[in-house]
Amino acid sequence: IDYFKPSNGTVEKKITITQSARNAIRIPLCGTTRTYADSAIGLSLLTNYIKKWNGKCRLGTLTDGGAGVVVHGMNDCAYKQAWSEFAANLKELRANGNKIASVCMTRSGYHCVVFGRNSWRGNIPAAMKKDLLQYERNNEQIYCVSISENGRYLIITDRHLTGSDTNVIAVLEKAGKMYGHLKYACVTNLGVVVVCKKGIYYHNIPTTLEMAMKSL
C-alpha cells in the first residue's frame, strides 16, 4: 500500500500512545510519524462493502489511485480496478475454496496473493520471488506479504522476517521485541506499520494514519 505523498517541509516526530477503546481493551501504539499530504481517493466502493460485512474486513490493500482489494471471511473479496491477472487469481481461489492469507497490490503493477500454507501467485520484485520460492520449498507458513510502489517489500513467515532493505528488517525486528508475535505488516515507499500480538509499531507513517489508528 502506498497512498500518501510527502509534502514540502516535512518534520518527523516521535510519539507513544496508549489507546482505550470502547470495550476497555488497551492497544499500545508506538512509532514515528511525518507530515504527509493525503492523496487517497475513491475508496467509497470498498468501504461500502466493508459496511455490508458489518465492518468485518479481515485483509485489505489500497493504492494511491483508489484501487484496492478487501477480503472478508475465508476468501470473499471485493475489489476496485484490480489488475486483471490479480482479479482472475482471486476469483479462482474463491471458486476453489482456498483461504486467502495475504494480499497486496500497487498502482505500478505489483500484486501478490498468498493462500493456504505457503502458496502464492503474482507479479512481484525478483528478490521477493526468490525469497518466497525458498520459503515454499522449506514448507514455512507465510503469514503476510507487502510491496510498495517503488519495490520495497516485506515477508513474514513462521520462521523468518524478511525485507527488501535493512531498514525494513530493523522495523520488523523492533516491533517483535516490543509487542511480541508479528501478525501483519505493511510497507510503503517511506514507512512501515507492523501489527503484533500485543500492540502496533510504526515507522515514518503519515500523522493522519496515526490519528486514524488512535480513533479505532
Feature-to-residue mapping (PLM):
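Trp/Gly-enriched beta-strand/coil motifs that build multi-repeat beta-propeller-like domains
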Residues: 2-216
